[in-house]
Amino acid sequence: MTNAFIRRPLGSRAAAVALAVALGAALPAAAFAKNPMVGGAPMYADKTIVENAVNSKDHTTLVAAVKAAGLVDTLSGPGPFTVFAPTNAAFAKLPAGTVETLVKPENKATLTKILTYHVVPGVHTAKALMAEVKKGGGEAQLKTVEGEPLTVTSKGKKVYVTDAKGSTATVTVANVMQSNGVIHVINGVLQP
C-alpha cells in the first residue's frame, strides 16, 4: 500500500507550506494573541481604546474623566496611542474630592493635562518598553501627548511608570491591544 502523502510531488508540499507561512506573516501578531480581560470585560483588539474602556467596570472613573475632558473623539481616532489607564482604585487614592473637582467644567484644562499625561504616541508594548529600559541603562523616557515625559523602569517582568512628581505606578495588566493602540492598566494616577 502506498502512502498518498509520499507520492505527492515535493513542489506542491513546498508551495502549501510557503502559502501557509505567507498568510501567517500577513496577519498582525495581535490577531493571534488573546487580549486579557479588564474589569471583568473582554477587550477586543478590533475595537478602539474608548470602545473597550467603557466596558471595564474598573475604569468607570477614567471613562467619566475622558468624557468630561472632551477626549472621546481623540481616543476613538486612529492613533496609535499607548494609554496608561488608572483604575477606579487608583483614582480613589487621590485626596478626597479631587476627582469631583477635576471633572467640573471650569477645570477642563487641568483634567485634560492630567489625562493626556497618561497617553504616549505610538504603540509601546510591555516587551518594547522593557527593551527601551534595557537600552537606556535601567530607564526609558517617554514623551506624553501632554508634552512632559514619563519615566519607565522594570524589574523582572514588572513595568513601572514614574511621573514628573516622583510617584510610581505599576502596570498591573499589560498589552491590552486595541485597533488604535495599546492599553496598560496601572494602579496609580500620574501627574505632570
Predicted regions and their residues:
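Bacterial N-terminal signal peptides that target proteins for export
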Residues: 3-18
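Bacterial N-terminal signal peptides
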Residues: 16-26
